[in-house]
Each structure stands twice: as structure tokens, then as C-alpha cells.
Amino acid sequence: MSLMSSSMVLCHCLSFSSQNPDPESSSSSLLRYKPCDSISLWGKRRKKLWRFVPSAEKNNSHTGNNNKRRRSWWQRFFFDDDGNWLGLRDDDIVDETTELAKDDEMSDEEKFETWKRRAEAIVELREGQEEIGDSGVVADVTKKWEDWIVDSDDSFVESWTRDSAGSDDNLELDELTIPDGGLVKMVRDMVLGAEEEDILYEDRIFRYASSKSAKFLAVLILIPWALDFLAHDYLLMPFLDRYVKTVPLAAQTLDVRRNQKLEMVKELNREKARYRLEVEIGKSPPLSDDDLWWEMRGKALELRDEWRLENRKAFANIWSDMVFGISLFVLLYANQGRVALLKFTGYKIINNISDTGKAFLIILITDIFLGYHSESGWETLLEIIMEHYGLEVEQSTITIFICLVPVIMDACVKLWLFKFLPRLSPRVSNIFQEMKRH
């Protein structure tokens, strides 16, 4: 059985070429040996049994790639017989070049999806090992070594491997298995770097996601802001200046409003009081009524022009902010992969925060926007928004808005805290239950 299997494997590695376009090399290449990377010899000291085992290829076997990558320099120094201690083999160089070429062909989204699937698989494997415990170590190692040994492309070698393995597999697995707990595991991880590979890989994923997310976030901020600035200052404002001069209806629409006139009156009264104070303290010469009237008239015209300019800017803000929103929507819609990457980064950042930190952030945000002292903050925010767009709203409307919207938001947040948060993070929910708000 062993001899028949060996002959089949050797025939599998030899390739006969009957046609050769080169006449000079046709005689020498009639029987040509094809290098077979999937054949390795393993020996047993106990039973003196030598057998051929097909190894998994790099691109098809994740476990084989990990085992090769985990071989440290001193293992190659003591156990490799070819003298190539740094691992610079021709096949490895060719394979690495092929992998680099494939990585260059893949887009950033495809690379991220591949790395994300591998990271999720690593996390699921760790969780499964923690749930199974020491009883599942042999089964896990058996599955890894079966995936590395068995070649699904060669049915003959696969059947021979299953028949010839027999009961010796358990002995080999017992020899290859290393205990997971205590000092032995720590020393093994330090020497072999078994867990360091996964940690470095996860760090590389998070570093890649963080850099890409930071760049995309900068694009989301800079490009819409630049378009907003260009549309406001170089398109809309010059157009409105000419349009107001030629169209009387537009000039009337963007003229000084009632509340602005009241502000102008207050400013003129303060200016008149300032002139009188300077005359009384001797800082300015006394002015006649006509001179004071001309001074107040010039100040009133200056204030009128300023308020008209503010009205045109507020009207231009509406359209420029629409440009900002449309450009932001286009960027988000055209970059779904980067949006998913940004969500992944945000999820990882939030997930890395401790439960106490999460509870602190929730308390801070809710108290700022929904606390008993947040009424003045909401009022100021609404006034800034109304002034930005040049809207004239009564104080009663702002009061009604503050009495309704923050209260509804507070009810929704409390419902989420007491109903859905215990499912997502029980420890954070326990912190909230221990707190007594007065």
C-alpha cells in the first residue's frame, strides 16, 4: 500500500511533455521533472514509517501559512538543512511577489473586507476556545492539522492519507499539542510568538482602518466646506449684489427688517450718549445740533448698509449650505466602502472604551443636551441658527420648541437606557442603576 501510494504521488509530480516548440530542447525535455511543493517527508522514530504528506498551498490554507509564519529564526537555524537560515528561498520570493501583485490588484475595500473577515474569524476562534476550554484543544488541533495535511485537489493522495494515518494521528497530535495554561503557555508565546502574530495582525487592521477613516473624515469635512466657501463668497454674494441693484423687489426683500431697525435705534442711542459723554469730559469739542444730526445720519446709513449685507449673507447661507449638504451626500453615497470602514473604526473606538468611560460619556452628553440647566443652551443654539439663516422667529415659538423637543428626546433616551442598554452592555446598565440622580 505504501509503495503504490508513493508511486502515484511521484507520478503526480512528474510531467511528460510530448510537444515542445523548441527543437533543440525537445530531446532533453522529453521527461521533465516538475517541482512539487506539496510533497514532504515525515518520519516516525517509533515505527520507522516514512510517508508522503501533501501540504497545503499558501493561498488555499490559512493554517499552513500561519505555521510557516510562526517559525522563528532559531527554528530555521537549527532545523533547516539547506543552509538558508533567513528563509530567502526562490519559491518563497516568487510566492511573495505573486501575493504582492495580487494585493496591488485588490482595492482598499477588498483588502479591508478580507482583513475584517480574518479578524472576525480570529475573535470567534478565541471565543470558541474560551467556551470549550482544555477539552477542545485536541479537537481544534486535529482540525487544523487535517486542514493543513489533506489536499482536496488530489483524491488519490487524500484517500491514501486517511487509510495510512490510522491510530498514529492521536499520538502525533499529543506530541504536537502544547498546554494552554500557566507558565508553559507564556514561555511558548514569548519564544514562538504564537499569540503575537494575531495581536500584531489586529493592530495592523485597526491602524489601517484608523488611517483610512481619518483621511475619509478629512475629505468629508474639507471638500464640502471648500465648496460651501466658494459658492458663498465667489458665486452667490457677487450675484446678489448685482441682483439687488437691478431688481427692486429683491432689494425690498433683503432690506432691513423690523427687529434689525430696533437694533439700529439702540445703537444710535448708544452712539449719541457716547458723543455727549466725550463732550462732558472734554475729550471732544462741543457739537451743534446740526453737526450731531449729520453724525447720527452717517452712522445710521452705515448701520443700514451693514444690516443689508448681513441679510444678503444670510440668504446666501441657505444655498451654500444646500451645496454643502448635497456634496456631503454624494461623497457618502459614492464611497460606501469607506463609510463602512468609518463605522468599523467608530465601533472599535467605542468598544475599546471601558464600561466606566462609556457610562461617563452617556451621562455627560445627556446632561449637556437634556439636563435641567440645558434650557439656556438650547435657546442660544436656536438663536445662532436663526441668525445664520436670517430667520425672524418670535420668542414664544422658541419657548414652545424648547418645552417639547428636549423633553421628547429625554424620554427616548431614558427608554433606551432602561430597556435596550442592559442587552447591549449589562455592566454599564448596572452603573446607571447604582447611581441616584437627585
From Swiss-Prot:
Signal peptide: none
Gene deletion effect: Pale-green phenotype in developing leaves with reduced chloroplast size, specifically under continuous light but not in the dark or in short-day, and associated with non-photochemical quenching (NPQ). The double mutant missing DLDG1 and FLAP1 (dldg1 flap1) has a pale-green phenotype similar to the dldlg1 simple mutant in continuous light, but a lighter pale-green aspect in fluctuating light and higher NPQ than in flap1 single mutant under short-day condition.
Transit peptide: 1-54
Keyword Transit peptide belongs to the record: yes
Membrane-topology descriptor: Multi-pass membrane protein
Top-rank taxon: Eukaryota
Keyword set includes Coiled coil: no
Subcellular localization, as worded in the UniProt entry: Plastid, Chloroplast envelope; Plastid, Chloroplast membrane
Keyword list, A-Z: Antiport, Chloroplast, Hydrogen ion transport, Ion transport, Membrane, Plastid, Potassium, Potassium transport, Transit peptide, Transmembrane, Transmembrane helix, Transport
Annotated catalysed reactions: K(+)(in) + H(+)(out) = K(+)(out) + H(+)(in); Ca(2+)(in) + H(+)(out) = Ca(2+)(out) + H(+)(in)
Predominant cellular place of this UniProt entry's protein: plastid
InterPro entries reported for this sequence: CemA
Pfam families assigned to the protein according to its UniProt record, in alphabetical order: CemA (PF03040)
Molecular function in Gene Ontology: potassium:proton antiporter activity
Transmembrane segments: 216-236, 314-334, 359-379, 398-418
A GO biological-process term: regulation of intracellular pH
Function: Promotes K(+)/H(+) antiport activity supporting K(+) efflux to control H(+) homeostasis in chloroplasts. Also able to ensure Ca(2+)/H(+) antiport activity in vitro. Essential for chloroplast pH regulation and optimization of non-photochemical quenching (NPQ), a regulatory mechanism that dissipates excess light energy; acts downstream of PSBS but independently from PGR5 and FLAP1.
Protein family: Belongs to the CemA family.
Protein name, per record: Protein DAY-LENGTH-DEPENDENT DELAYED-GREENING 1, chloroplastic
Organism name: Arabidopsis thaliana
Gene that specifies this protein: DLDG1
